[in-house]
Amino acid sequence: VSIPARIIQTARNRDLPLRAKAAAASLRCLNPDFEYLFFDDAEVDAFVQKEFPQHRHVFDAFPYRIQKYDFFRYLAVFRLGGFYFDMDVFLASGLRELLRAACVFPFEELTANRYLRRRHGMDWEIGNYAFGAAPSHPFLEAVIQNCVRAQREPAWAEVMSEGIPRLLRSEFEVLNTTGPGLLTRTLAENPELAGDVTVLFPEDVCDQREWHQFGTLGVHEMEGSWRTAGSYLRRRFCNLWEDWALRRQLEDSRRRGKTRSLRASVQAGTAPVRA
């Protein structure tokens, strides 16, 4: 089973800013034979209601719009198959070489998340700004189930906040309930699914210039429009803490070398890891 030639994107409405239009144009121009599907908010609501009525109450219960968008992208690709892209992802070449895969996600960055590092021995995360999968792929099914669990069982998701100052935990809620943190945790806790997932690792995972890309095919511009509103000082403190926490972990990551393997990481995560 392979990924169908389909691109899925979503935004609040079709009145897109110029940068988003340019990003979408890069996808379509480089993949002219791919089906292109765009969903605005009303169409997202209609899709969830029609295709996943059993999850409608979960979708509605997420407090942040970005959580709804995250949940929708997993549902849409699970049902339809194809590639999802955020509106700030630009491609440099076409996607055809990835159609042979069953499920593909980008390496996002090295992580300072204590739960992933200590419980599973993983010092990196995958991203959800761009990914592809065949319809009904079991990894996406597991991701959807964990999104539901994170919404219904806050204590289950809360363990991902280990080591984060309580004042800042709301800033990381999205990441750990529907975003990259949840994705990576799902991968780490389901090693039987890892063999069917392709991760687009850079040549050097410790080189921050190679983070937030879609392999060698594209780049995520990291607009971060989903970030919760708050005071400048709060956002600044959050960014400073995140940078400090990551710097503390980079030395350990550099000792591991510049390359990573999904199989090796997941296998390592099945063994006890020292704190």
Regions flagged by a language model, labelled:
Residues 70-82:
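Small-residue hinge/turn detector
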